[in-house]
Amino acid sequence: MKIIRILAAVFIAAGLVSSAGAQPNRQTYRDAMGRNQGTATTDNYGKTTYRDAMGRTQGSASTDNYGKTTYRDAMGRNQGSATTDNYGKTTYRDSMGRTTGTATTDSYGKTTYRDSMGRITGTSTKDSSGRVTYRDAQGRVIGTKK
């Protein structure tokens, strides 16, 4: 359950879940073994709701007019935020405003995630079919999104 919360926050902040189109956008997250870990559904207003594999709401994310994404738990309590600068670097903050990590995407589409100390915590890559593969700092596959 923890992996879906972490991945979901990263996916939204990195702009990997889109709200374009008339139909709600639904993404399914799977672990390295291909087991369903949950979903993220974005409505036409840009609010994303995260659910676990059993369909229970785990939290949500919404973006304001200034591009700041705020994450909330299932009870609606603020869990943190993310903002992206003009260079494409996304900074994640906890509910108290302290920096918890960053994400940067290179020209090949590989996103590198770092903790607050600048250490690499993982990467993600997107293939030609749109499947995103997530790896830990050692390069092991930890999950996918399609």
Describe every region a protein language model picked out:
Residues 23-146:
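Intrinsically disordered, low-complexity proline/glycine-rich segments
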Residues 5, 18-22:
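Sec/Tat signal peptide C-region and signal peptidase I cleavage site
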Residues 15-18, 38:
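Short, low-complexity, intrinsically disordered N-terminal segments
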Residues 1-8:
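Bacterial N-terminal signal peptides that target proteins for export
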Residues 8-15:
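Bacterial N-terminal signal peptides
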